[in-house]
Design a protein with these regions (language model features):
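Catalytic core and acceptor-binding pocket of nucleotide-sugar-dependent glycosyltransferases
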Residues: 53-127
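Short, flexible, basic/aromatic active-site loop/helix in glycosyltransferases
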Residues: 39-53
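Short catalytic/ligand-binding loop motif for oxyanion handling, primarily in non-cytosolic enzymes
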Residues: 2-5, 34-38, 106-115
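An N-terminal, helix-rich hydrophobic module
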Residues: 27, 119-121, 140
Length: 145
């Protein structure tokens, strides 16, 4: 659930940067975020470490098509995609994975501000309910009083 206006111009700049610099994945939501600066643009991006949890993530990102297709496995669900097994497959990828830095203590940073997890195990998170109520968006099973 997006809660602020998307900075489209910045997204377009990041797409161009990723394309021109042969980036495997440019994460637009630093969740988890990088720990080390990206050598080419250290104030804008950090490099993701292949050994970190959720190195492979389905958070908002700009993917190199071949990189993403290599990581997709038929009949695999989203939890498998983010698993350690798939992260090990990513060790074969030579293209770097980078991420925007967090702009504040809590994610997300970057050009798209959104609620990272709106539903957990079939239950709406309170932060998501609050946003839907604020925006007057009805959802099944929840009253918007």
């Amino acid at each position: 659930l997006i809660y602020k206006k998307v900075n489209t111009k910045l997204v377009e700049q990041y797409v161009e940067y990723a394309h021109n610099n042969d980036i495997g994945c440019l994460r637009l939501c630093p969740c988890p975020g990088p720990k080390l600066p990206w050598k080419h643009m250290p104030k804008t991006f950090g490099v993701l470490n292949k050994n970190d949890d959720y190195y492979i993530s389905l958070q908002t990102a700009i993917w190199d098509k071949e990189t993403l297709l290599y990581l997709l496995v038929p009949k695999q669900n989203i939890w498998h995609f983010e698993s350690d097994i798939n992260a090990k497959r990513a060790h074969n990828i030579k293209k770097p994975f980078i991420s925007v830095w967090r702009e504040e203590d809590l994610p997300p940073g970057g050009p798209i501000k959104y609620i990272i997890t709106a539903i957990t195990r079939g239950v709406w998170e309170q932060v998501a309910i609050d946003l839907l109520v604020k925006e007057n968006i009805p959802i099944n099973g929840i009253k918007n009083d």
